[in-house]
Amino acid sequence: MIQPQTHLNVADNSGARELMCIRIIGASNRRYAHIGDVIVAVIKEAVPNMPLERSEVVRAVIVRTCKELKRDNGMIIRYDDNAAVVIDQEGNPKGTRIFGAIARELRELNFTKIVSLAPEVL
């Protein structure tokens, strides 16, 4: 469950290392974001000499959360960290690689480019 002021790791090579959620895209008063939701975030930590810089406002899609994700078949998935992938306005990732496992639910939400770049889909 991601809410405003939550810090997230970045699961791609876009140049950002850590994000802080400042808004959840969707309804005007949504409190929490889950896997597959798009957020507005600010870059808190970045790699030097990369296109994305610190204090830049970006959009990101959440790919991993510590909070459990229940599937229809009864399976529960939980990750060790909260992570997101930086995306552009069309929903394509800004990086060219994805690190770590991501959930299968992203394919159903039309983030197929992120799913194709991921090394493991759970």
Swiss-Prot record:
GO terms for biological process: translation. Disulfide bonds: none annotated. It comes from the Eukaryota. It is found in: Plastid, Chloroplast. Keywords: Chloroplast, Plastid, Ribonucleoprotein, Ribosomal protein, RNA-binding, rRNA-binding. GO terms for molecular function: rRNA binding; structural constituent of ribosome. One of its GO terms (cellular component) is large ribosomal subunit. Pfam families: Ribosomal_L14. Part of the 50S ribosomal subunit. Belongs to the universal ribosomal protein uL14 family. Binds to 23S rRNA. This is Large ribosomal subunit protein uL14c. It comes from Nicotiana tabacum (Common tobacco). The gene is rpl14.
